[in-house]
Amino acid sequence: MKTNSEIENRMQDIEYALLGKALVFEDCTEYILRQLVNYEFKCSRHKNIFIVFKHLKDNALPITVDSAWEELLRRRVKDIDKSYLGIMLHDAMFNDKLRPISHTVLLDDLSVCSAEENLTNFIFRSFNEYNENPLRRSPFLLLDRIKDRLDRTIAKTFSTRSVRGRSVYDIFSQAELGVLARIKKRRAAYSENNDSFYDGLPTGYQDIDSKGVILANGNFVIIAARPSIGKTALAIDIAINIAIHQRRRVGFLSLEMSAGQIVERIISNLTGVSGEKLQRGSLSEEEIFCIEEAGNTIRDSHLYICSDNQYKLNLIANQIRLLKRDDRVDVIFIDYLQLINSSVGENRQNEIADISRTLRGLAAELNIPIVCLSQLSRKVEDRANKVPMLSDLRDSGQIEQDADVILFINRKETSPNCEITVGKNRHGSVFSTVLQFDPKTSKFSAIKKVW
């Protein structure tokens, strides 16, 4: 890792190069000045030059060596002479090392240097705090303090980075990561493999997947229903489709059921042996053979179940990051949202809002779909048709705002059919479809059409 002095020297070089480009190239002057508004300059001379450039720009005055020098004199800035501005202009125009580098690349380099500086400071201060009193202080208290410092470091780093906007054409045309490149990759995936889910995952249900990409990368997805309607069953069914049939990596955080109970549901789903028979043990030799075969099937899958009773939001967020970093999961399921506790404890509504915002941010940060199960309020029971609505989401309207997709399950107890309604879809259409539900195996399937 670089030392602070090395990072600071590099940042001063970038400051110099950016101010030179702002002085010479009028087409990028405004952009550069806008990106440096909240930047903490490492060189006081560069800070004063930036202030002068911004003053000239804000007052519709030309930014030249002469105009900048006159303004510096008016402000009685004594540590800069006119020759420094002249050299800055010359280097921006003719220096072989500086001239070819675009201002956007320099701004990216400055963001990286700022992040390195923040990270170095975080490690240094955390190490010093540990060494101050390593034996007397509770390790849990120390970890909490380090975690708080890390959160502040991350917030500072990304708040500075997010200030910088980009032109529409840059976003469209950027190599590898631009919109055009992504569209071409989607087309290639569809043309070569008939794959319509380059940026996401199919649920495994044709009636849903043909109408939209629900599990798009970065999506925060809510599956909502009243108790005992099939939220967990649907989540497990989709997880099986992704992990076993699509050979992708899945993380499943169960706050309600044990890992063993989840696996029993998976076995029942795969074998068709009812959950009740698995619990009672009233199994035939043929059924035992099917269960062993199912074990061979799940052995080669990458479905990771976490059920260690971690209800605190910060611990769940850390667990999700570890699943992404260590197990490289493609999707996360959480069962369920109302069991999570947040440190924002003014009231339950604010707590749920904090949980929702955090999970939404994690989905975007890790660029994977996060699917969270949620209960509905009792208002849906008071409605004549029992059809769920967005306003039925329990405890907080923030869930409705944060979610990219909200999927409702509606099932009459006497009917084997479930209505699956996409009540919100930020990036596509809303729709409804019907799936068949087998309560014995907790399995959803397409309704067989009779011709």
Curated annotation (Swiss-Prot):
Gene Ontology CC annotations of this record: cytosol; primosome complex
Pfam families per record: DnaB, DnaB_C
InterPro entries documented for this protein: AAA+_ATPase, DNA_heli_DnaB-like_N_sf, DNA_helicase_DnaB-like_C, DNA_helicase_DnaB-like_N, P-loop_NTPase
Name this protein carries in UniProt: Probable plasmid replicative DNA helicase
Subunit record text: Homohexamer.
Location of the SF4 helicase domain: 194-451
Gene3D superfamilies xrefs: P-loop containing nucleotide triphosphate hydrolases
PROSITE patterns per record: SF4_HELICASE (PS51199)
Family membership noted in the UniProt record: Belongs to the helicase family. DnaB subfamily.
GO MF annotations, alphabetized: ATP binding; ATP hydrolysis activity; DNA binding; DNA helicase activity
Record organism: Chlamydia muridarum (strain MoPn / Nigg)
EC number annotated for this UniProt entry: 5.6.2.3
CDD domains on file: DnaB_C
Sequence positions that bind ATP: A225, R226, P227, S228, I229, G230, K231, T232
SUPFAM superfamilies (UniProt xref): N-terminal domain of DnaB helicase, P-loop containing nucleoside triphosphate hydrolases
UniProt enzyme class: isomerase
Function (record text): A replicative DNA helicase, it participates in initiation and elongation during DNA replication. Travels ahead of the DNA replisome, separating dsDNA into templates for DNA synthesis. A processive ATP-dependent 5'-3' DNA helicase it has DNA-dependent ATPase activity.
Keywords, sorted A to Z: ATP-binding, DNA replication, DNA-binding, Helicase, Hydrolase, Isomerase, Nucleotide-binding, Plasmid, Primosome
Gene Ontology terms: biological process: DNA replication, synthesis of primer
Reactions the enzyme catalyzes: Couples ATP hydrolysis with the unwinding of duplex DNA at the replication fork by translocating in the 5'-3' direction. This creates two antiparallel DNA single strands (ssDNA). The leading ssDNA polymer is the template for DNA polymerase III holoenzyme which synthesizes a continuous strand; ATP + H2O = ADP + phosphate + H(+)
